């Protein structure tokens, strides 16, 4: 017997939840990956993908087929699915889906700003932007000279606007300031998304809060790793960490003081969920920290589908689909470069 909240969930969102579960069922199987890694050329890869749910998505691509073309078409396809979900969603699912696009918007704005700094063609950079993070004012990013310019002229009408309140300054935009801006935006965004999910309650909070806590902790680890050997002070580094997650607050304080990878690993050793991840780095498989974090992310997103009546399945599906796209692009790159020794270093999903 369905309880009241679950019954209302089905009325408002049941169709889309069923649809996204169907999409998840169409992800590539392990047998598909076995077939893909045996392909000799990108044309072979294209032919095999035609036998999967991807169908003729490369039909309009002219020869020669490239990894970039395959990657672009896969992203477009994912974007089409996501836009269908968004166009047919009701509140508060609509707001949840908008939160999902914000990370892609941040990832699009930053390269555009760096490109403007280096006098690169806006059109060239736009071609590399993620379709899920596109917004009308993107092309005007090159007119901004300070974060305040960026906010007032470009981002004030976008979903990113609320996250800029903590990032406003009159500092000139150089490469370091732009990178700091990226991390501050992500911090504000993740904190707001986490608060939204927590306040929503029910199964959505139970599924999404641990996923976002992991994302916050992952960002803290990666920020720390990337700051070694740079001019970023320990105090400034700590201000970039999202203020929630398993590491918050004591782990973040210790992480801010770390001076190398071993000291960072010592912090992770205090947390049962992170200790095995750091132990898996290197070794015979040559895994990077990024690899083990992706593997953990996949596990969490697959588990999200074990629960019903929640928004987390939409987030989980997009993340799993993105990992599938990375996997196919990796295999395609290995085929293209004739570098087959690493072709099996993709991250399995199912």
Swiss-Prot record:
A cellular component term, taken from the record's GO annotations: proton-transporting V-type ATPase, V0 domain
In alphabetical order, the GO MF annotations are: proton-transporting ATPase activity, rotational mechanism
Q: Which Pfam families match?
A: vATP-synt_AC39
Q: SUPFAM superfamilies recorded for this chain?
A: V-type ATP synthase subunit C
Please give the superkingdom of this protein's source: Eukaryota
Role summary: Subunit of the V0 complex of vacuolar(H+)-ATPase (V-ATPase), a multisubunit enzyme composed of a peripheral complex (V1) that hydrolyzes ATP and a membrane integral complex (V0) that translocates protons. V-ATPase is responsible for acidifying and maintaining the pH of intracellular compartments and in some cell types, is targeted to the plasma membrane, where it is responsible for acidifying the extracellular environment. May play a role in coupling of proton transport and ATP hydrolysis. Regulator of osteoclast fusion and bone formation.
* Protein name (database record): V-type proton ATPase subunit d 2
Q: Which organism is it from?
A: Pongo abelii (Sumatran orangutan)
User: What lineage is this protein's organism placed in?
Assistant: Eukaryota, Metazoa, Chordata, Craniata, Vertebrata
């Amino acid at each position: 017997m369905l309880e009241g909240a679950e019954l209302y969930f089905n009325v408002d969102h049941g169709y889309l939840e069923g649809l996204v579960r169907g999409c998840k069922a169409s992800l590539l199987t392990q047998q598909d990956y076995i077939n893909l890694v045996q392909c000799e050329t990108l044309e072979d890869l294209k032919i095999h993908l035609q036998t999967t749910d991807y169908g003729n998505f490369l039909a309009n691509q002219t020869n020669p087929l490239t990894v970039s073309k395959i990657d672009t078409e896969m992203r477009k396809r994912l974007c089409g699915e996501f836009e269908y979900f968004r166009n047919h969603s009701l509140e508060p699912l609509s707001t949840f889906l908008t939160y999902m696009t914000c990370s892609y918007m941040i990832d699009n704005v930053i390269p555009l700003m760096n490109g403007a700094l280096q006098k690169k063609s806006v059109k060239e950079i736009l071609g590399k932007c993620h379709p899920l993070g596109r917004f009308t004012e993107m092309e005007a990013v090159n007119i901004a000279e300070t974060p305040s310019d960026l906010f007032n002229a470009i981002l004030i009408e976008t979903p990113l606007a609320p996250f800029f309140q903590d990032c406003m300054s009159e500092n000139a935009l150089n490469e370091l300031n732009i990178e700091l801006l990226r991390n501050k935006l992500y911090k504000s965004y993740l904190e707001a998304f986490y608060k939204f999910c927590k306040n929503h309650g029910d199964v959505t909070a139970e599924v999404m809060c641990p996923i976002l806590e992991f994302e916050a902790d992952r960002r803290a680890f990666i920020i720390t790793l990337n700051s070694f050997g740079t001019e970023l002070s320990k105090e400034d580094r700590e201000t970039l960490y999202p203020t929630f997650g398993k590491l918050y607050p004591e782990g973040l304080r210790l992480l801010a003081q770390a001076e190398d990878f071993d000291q960072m690993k010592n912090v992770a050793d205090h947390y049962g969920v992170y200790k095995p991840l750091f132990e898996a780095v290197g070794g015979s498989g040559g895994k990077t920290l990024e690899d083990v974090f992706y593997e953990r992310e996949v596990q969490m997103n697959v588990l999200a589908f074990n629960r019903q009546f929640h928004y987390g399945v939409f987030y989980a599906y997009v993340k799993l689909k993105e990992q599938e796209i990375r996997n196919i692009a990796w295999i395609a790159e290995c085929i293209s470069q004739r570098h087959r020794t690493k072709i099996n270093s993709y991250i399995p999903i199912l």
